[in-house]
């Protein structure tokens, strides 16, 4: 009876077969280059001329007195072109001036620059290659070189 059941299982495809996969181990050989084949790279440091692209002989200063918020992009473009920008916001409404300062301070931060207040409503934006010291800031505010209230 066991014979009949095994024949039926084999016809239906249910017969258990133990299959063994035979694997052949392949051997890999690493190709090693001789040290004689490697050529050293020789650089001539005397002929290489590296120039900083951000070096400029003259620094330009842009002085703006915006009358609306739309001028914020022009201020940021000047800062992006590595110019020092003086911004006078005394003629703007308080809310518009705050929005303008938020926008240009974010751009200044993204470009690696610095925003400092000189006087009430007057700000200086300096690019990353320019440093404004506190002595200069104190001197500008004490001498009132930029008297915008006239």
Curated annotation (Swiss-Prot):
Keywords annotated in UniProt: Cell cycle, Cell division, Cytoplasm, Septation
InterPro entries named in the record: Cell_div_SepF, Cell_div_SepF/SepF-rel, SepF-like_sf
Cystine bridges: none
Gene3D superfamilies reported for this sequence: SepF-like protein
Principal location class: cytoplasm
GO terms for cellular component: cytoplasm
Pfam families in the record: SepF
Places the protein is found: Cytoplasm
GO terms (BP aspect): division septum assembly; FtsZ-dependent cytokinesis
PANTHER family reported for this sequence: CELL DIVISION PROTEIN SEPF (PTHR35798:SF1)
Assembly and binders: Homodimer. Interacts with FtsZ.
Family in the record: Belongs to the SepF family.
Protein purpose: Cell division protein that is part of the divisome complex and is recruited early to the Z-ring. Probably stimulates Z-ring formation, perhaps through the cross-linking of FtsZ protofilaments. Its function overlaps with FtsA.
Name recorded for this polypeptide: Cell division protein SepF
Biological source species: Clostridium beijerinckii (strain ATCC 51743 / NCIMB 8052)
């Amino acid at each position: 009876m066991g014979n009949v059941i095994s024949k039926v299982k084999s016809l239906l495809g249910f017969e258990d077969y133990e299959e063994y996969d035979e694997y052949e181990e392949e051997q890999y050989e690493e190709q090693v280059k001789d040290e004689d084949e490697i050529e050293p790279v020789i650089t001539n440091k005397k002929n290489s001329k590296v120039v900083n692209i951000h070096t400029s002989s003259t620094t330009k200063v842009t002085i703006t007195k915006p009358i609306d918020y739309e001028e914020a992009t022009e201020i940021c473009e000047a800062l992006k072109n590595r110019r020092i920008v003086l911004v006078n916001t005394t003629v703007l409404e308080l809310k518009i001036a705050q929005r303008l300062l938020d926008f240009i301070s974010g751009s200044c931060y993204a470009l690696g620059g610095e925003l400092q207040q000189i006087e009430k409503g007057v700000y200086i934006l300096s690019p990353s290659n320019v440093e404004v010291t506190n002595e200069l800031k104190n001197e500008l505010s004490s001498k009132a070189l930029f008297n915008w209230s006239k």
